[in-house]
């Protein structure tokens, strides 16, 4: 059972940057960025390829840089070519399939068996003991969350937040929303690629289809965290993304361990939960309207 808890914590922290990325794009910028699935695989592909070449430490920032480039393309399509945000993400995501194959040497998967990773390098130092993978995953994710919180409190970070709230006000303040959207999407996709890079080295493998459904899982983590902690402030939203990711992985582990729901159906269940959570405000308004309508009929 302890192994189940340890694995759930490790995966929770490893996938948390995806939830942070979606918090930045979906909540802060109010943009539905669908580059996530392809960008996750891009990060893993770059990381695994460089790690196999003997550069596990260089692999992580290189993967983040590749993710930022993917975010830049999405932002360019959206801001310069006036492509709707959803379509811009779909176009970039489609193109990334070929880029990811190219990064893996035109193979659909790649393995790191026999290669050193950032995790094995930490194990060789003796730090963390048997929990070395959790220590590294938690340290990287918490560092990213802290830096993101600090960044969103800077002048540029406040401009990005303002762009999501009211782009017209940003223009009236002599700020360029094109620049703030571009920076925000580059940063969010860099976080997604970071998650892919760490997961690739953690699992010692990458597959071209390993990113399928990542955007839905990230949204589920974000929504679970917001349900538990709320999202009244940016800092609470960041914390909610972290907590939600860990809780989601615990739910996944319990389902996998107890077999309450077939594991094959878990992504379907995740999609239903996300759909209901997103539709919740509209459903509440509909329920209130029906209740008011029923009360008027009784009064008449």
Q: Could you tell me what each predicted segment is?
A:
Residues 3-55, 76-81, 223-231, 272:
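Single transmembrane alpha-helix segments in multi-pass membrane proteins
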Residues 11, 86-87, 108, 133-137, ...:
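Loop-to-transmembrane alpha-helix initiation sites
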Residues 22, 55-94, 99, 141-145, ...:
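Alpha-helical transmembrane segments within multi-pass membrane transporters and channels
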Residues 27-32, 72-117, 122-123, 155, ...:
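Short loop segments and helix-boundary regions at transmembrane helix junctions
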Residues 70, 130-215:
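Helix-loop-helix "hairpin" substructures at the membrane interface of multi-pass membrane proteins
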Residues 85, 93-153, 183, 265, ...:
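Transmembrane helix-bundle core of multi-pass membrane transporters
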Residues 165-172, 176-179, 232, 239, ...:
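Cytosolic-side transmembrane-helix boundaries in multi-pass membrane proteins
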Residues 192, 196-267:
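Transmembrane alpha-helical segments in multi-pass inner-membrane proteins
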